[in-house]
């Protein structure tokens, strides 16, 4: 069999058949996914906040449901079978290489297999069982949580939206005392309030290890913050939007970790799912491209954090950590760690023996607004993670595993180039590489679609696309996968050719059309640190933290 397209390229009926069968297949996949998102009308509620919370609970049940696991597994197998059928029907067996460079090109097909380890780890999430829910979910706990937002201070609109989203959600899901810390490089015009502290990093501030960028700001915050050592810190970016399910997930995680701490264990560091649909209407293409990140959260990263072992890095946003654990490892990571300070810090925490965990709920953020920022964002990640692998004070095995993932990231990008080139050469492909590549591709199709499903299903009903528009998004999600893969590869190749030398900050708008991901609440309120809910209880709202199937 052959993965090239020389036969179809010379016979237009083959191309038409390929496109037609592909579209029918994609529509079928979209309908299957849409079927899982339909909610019974009898569960509809009248109050916006309760309706949003119940919708969250149903999504949680869907993701945890055994049938949904089988649906995703079926999508992987079904997609692979369809690929094999299309190859057998539309393509010839390919030709053998005649020149040395053709033999070299043929061997490049094995690069398809480079993504197999990451795909396998992601697939492990299908067999992991979610932890049991605590019996006292919803009970108010007297543990202060500080939402720490780090920004350059240039986008006041985004900061204002983030602060408002925290207050809106905490006014409804009042599960713990809270405060907000905004860490900026310049003065910002945020209205003073009892629940808000603005920390301005002095322009002449220098850390002992010469850390830069966000690492410098975080180190300053840990030095001057007045948080109690047993308080908790939730890290988010300037455009982050907190949701109801996330507040519940934070509450559950803090309660569980405080129980472990009382038994003599070190509280673990938590992370969860991030959605990127805030600008779906304004920037649908790049939002679809970031469906992979959400799908990766609920698969590969879920496997990592549920196992408690750090092996593929950590996001810089959605980090939940107790203050004394956070300050035990300095964010003064030096120039080498300043590009991806989050992962550098996390690997040093792992070296100290600190464990990791999954946190229910999701944080809403936005995708890059243009192709240049998209590629440069990926370049920063790739360059920074290599510095982590080379310089982080972590165990050798942990650094080697990270190097393996980073090498596979590059090689899989090369495999994408091979696919394009072989469209014109028509070389035969070794069947093991073909089978492995087909399975990897099928897994990524499922990951993209699952990420999109979760993102759309978590949007409030009034902002969610119509059934027809959603169907179009699912079809576009798969049809544009070669484009998305090229964008991801461009970031990696850019990192190899011109490694990140600074800290590229992508442009983010202020107010977004996406609004709150899981509610339509308009009321704004705040809870001052140390205040207590009546009778020690949260408001009587039937909610549940949003989870993935493995969290």
Say what each PLM segment does.
Residues 199-227, 249-337, 375, 379-390:
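Long helical/loop segments within the catalytic core of UDP-sugar-dependent glycosyltransferases
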Residues 229-243:
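Short beta-strand-to-loop acidic/aromatic patch adjacent to the donor-nucleotide binding site
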Residues 271-273, 356-363:
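Catalytic beta-strand/loop signature of glycosyltransferases that borders the donor
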Residues 162-177:
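Short, acidic, metal-binding catalytic loop of nucleotide-sugar glycosyltransferases
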Residues 337-345:
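Acidic donor-binding loop at a coil-to-helix junction in glycosyltransferase catalytic cores
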Residues 143-148, 179, 344:
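Cell-envelope/extracellular polymer assembly enzymes that use nucleotide-activated donors
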Residues 359-373:
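Active-site donor/metal-binding and catalytic loop motifs
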Residues 27-68, 79-87, 106-144, 168, ...:
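Juxtamembrane C-terminal module of membrane proteins
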């Amino acid at each position: 069999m052959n993965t090239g397209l020389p036969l179809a390229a010379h016979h237009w009926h083959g191309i038409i058949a390929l496109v037609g069968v592909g579209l029918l297949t994609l529509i079928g996949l979209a309908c299957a996914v849409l079927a899982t998102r339909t909610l019974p009308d009898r569960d509809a509620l009248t109050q916006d906040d309760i309706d949003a919370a119940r919708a969250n609970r149903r999504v949680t049940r869907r993701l945890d449901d055994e049938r949904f696991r089988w649906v995703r597994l079926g999508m992987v197998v079904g997609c692979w079978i369809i690929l094999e059928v299309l190859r057998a029907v539309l393509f010839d067996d390919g030709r053998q290489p005649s020149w040395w460079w053709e033999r070299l090109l043929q061997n490049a097909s094995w690069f398809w297999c480079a993504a197999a380890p990451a795909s396998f780890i992601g697939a492990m999430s299908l067999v992991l069982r979610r932890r049991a829910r605590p019996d006292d979910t919803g009970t108010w706990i007297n543990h202060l949580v500080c939402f720490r937002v780090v920004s350059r201070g240039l986008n006041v609109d985004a900061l204002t939206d983030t602060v408002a989203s925290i207050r809106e959600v905490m006014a409804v899901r009042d599960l713990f005392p809270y405060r907000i810390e905004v860490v900026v490089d310049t003065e910002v015009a945020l209205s003073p309030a009892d629940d808000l502290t603005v920390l301005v990093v002095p322009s002449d501030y220098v850390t002992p290890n010469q850390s830069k960028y966000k690492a410098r700001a975080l180190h300053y915050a840990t030095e001057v913050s007045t948080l109690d050592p047993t308080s908790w810190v939730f890290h988010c970016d300037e455009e982050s939007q907190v949701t109801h399910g996330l507040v519940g997930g934070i509450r559950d995680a803090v309660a569980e970790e405080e129980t472990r701490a009382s038994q003599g264990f070190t509280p673990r560091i938590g992370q969860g799912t991030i959605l990127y649909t805030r600008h779906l209407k304004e920037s649908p293409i790049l939002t679809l491209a970031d469906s992979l990140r959400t799908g990766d959260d609920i698969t590969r990263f879920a496997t990592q954090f549920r196992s408690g072992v750090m092996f593929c890095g950590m996001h810089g946003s959605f980090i939940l950590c107790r203050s004394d654990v956070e300050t035990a490892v300095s964010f003064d990571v030096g120039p080498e760690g300043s590009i991806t300070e989050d992962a550098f810090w996390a690997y040093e925490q792992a070296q100290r023996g600190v464990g990791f965990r999954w946190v229910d709920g999701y944080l809403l953020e936005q995708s890059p607004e243009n192709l240049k920022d998209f590629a440069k964002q990926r370049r920063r990640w790739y360059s920074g993670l290599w510095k982590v692998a080379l310089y982080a004070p972590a165990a050798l095995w942990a650094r080697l595993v990270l190097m393996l993932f980073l090498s596979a990231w590059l090689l899989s990008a090369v495999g994408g180039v091979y696919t394009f080139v072989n469209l014109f050469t028509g070389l035969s492909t070794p069947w093991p590489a073909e089978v492995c590549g087909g399975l990897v591709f099928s897994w990524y199709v499922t990951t993209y679609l699952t990420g999109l499903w979760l993102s759309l299903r978590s949007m409030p009903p009034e902002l969610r696309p119509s059934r027809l528009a959603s169907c179009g998004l699912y079809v576009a999600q798969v049809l544009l996968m070669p484009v998305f893969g090229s964008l991801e590869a461009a970031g990696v190749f850019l990192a190899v050719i011109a490694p990140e030398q600074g800290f590229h900050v992508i442009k983010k708008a202020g107010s977004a059309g996406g609004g709150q991901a899981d509610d339509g609440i308009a009321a704004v309120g705040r809870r001052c640190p140390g205040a207590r809910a009546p009778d020690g209880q949260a408001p009587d709202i039937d909610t549940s933290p949003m989870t993935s199937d493995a969290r």
